[in-house]
Design a protein with these regions (language model features):
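Ligand-binding pockets and gating/stacking loops
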Residues: 1-275
């Protein structure tokens, strides 16, 4: 985040400025801006205003961090019995193996806090705040490869196409800000990693929800979102005029086909203009 510089800060500052005062816009533009304001709030009172969700793709196994499995060490080296495997198919990396030995963690675990949560010695600082954390260990998937497992974790299904958790948060919480996306995605590859984890846009996709809830990826540098700046030689007023004409064409299409996604696209274009 520290490398994002003025980019995100500039967008945040812009959200505090009256959008109608930023350059010359036509009457149609004003109407569209008022139409495509913040996302409507839900019909119930949300218990949270915002969600920061961190997903460490390719991070250490939970079996080495906080999911203590003493029997894995007790039976270390023993071939995995069929009663456990139950015909589970093999991965490409293990299909050539003759045996499938049980492997325990190489790290020591201790219990911490009043909750007596198990944490390994890999996380000495996290162990100091375990009573402020909730460990969910009941999730289960039959996926045996990273890609379908990660897709399941983000969308609740191994098959691509369903809304991501961030899109559901956007849908459930709404938005009080009409100048920034309600769902923002930041990617970080860390240091010293020659090949980052393959992360696909479907992991923050909106699925069958409106594209208003699609995650918007912010990049580092002066242009956190691509194509927001006016092209060279094109003024803000000229861009406003082009957007107005484009909106007229899209509105005609919406009247013909009745596809609500067309209105969502108009709203997204207007947000990009305000950003």
């Amino acid at each position: 985040i520290k490398n994002l510089g003025f980019g995100i800060g500039g967008l945040a500052l812009g959200s505090l400025i009256d959008p109608l005062s930023l350059g010359s816009i036509g009457e149609e533009g004003v109407a569209l801006q008022l139409q495509s304001g913040p996302l409507p709030l839900p019909h119930f009172a949300p218990k949270a205003k915002r969600v920061i969700y961190l997903f460490q793709s390719g991070g250490p196994s939970q079996l080495d961090l906080f999911d203590y499995k003493p029997f894995l060490n007790k039976y270390r080296g023993m071939d995995l019995p069929d009663s456990i495997r139950k015909g589970q198919r093999l991965t490409g990396m293990t299909s050539g193996q003759d045996k499938f030995p049980v492997t325990g963690s190489l790290f020591n675990f201790k219990q911490y806090g009043e909750s007596r949560a198990w944490v390994s010695d890999l996380m000495p600082n996290l162990s100091k705040v375990v009573d402020e954390l909730c460990f969910v260990k009941s999730m289960h998937t039959e996926a045996i490869n990273h890609d379908p497992a990660i897709t399941f974790f983000q969308t609740g299904s191994q098959l691509p196409g369903r809304p991501s958790i961030g899109s559901w948060m956007s849908y459930g919480l709404g938005s009080l800000n009409d100048n920034l996306p309600s769902f923002i995605v930041l990617l970080s590859t860390g240091n010293g990693k020659p090949q980052p984890q393959p992360l696909y846009s479907r992991l923050w996709g909106n699925g069958f929800l409106s594209s208003l809830h699609q995650g918007v990826q912010f990049r580092s540098g002066k242009d956190p979102v691509l194509y927001l700046q006016n092209p060279e030689g094109v003024s803000r007023a000229e861009r406003r005029k082009m957007l107005d004409h484009l909106a007229s064409l899209n509105e005609a299409q919406e009247k013909t086909f009745g596809d609500p996604e067309i209105n969502s696209r108009i709203s997204n274009y207007e947000m990009a203009y305000r950003m």
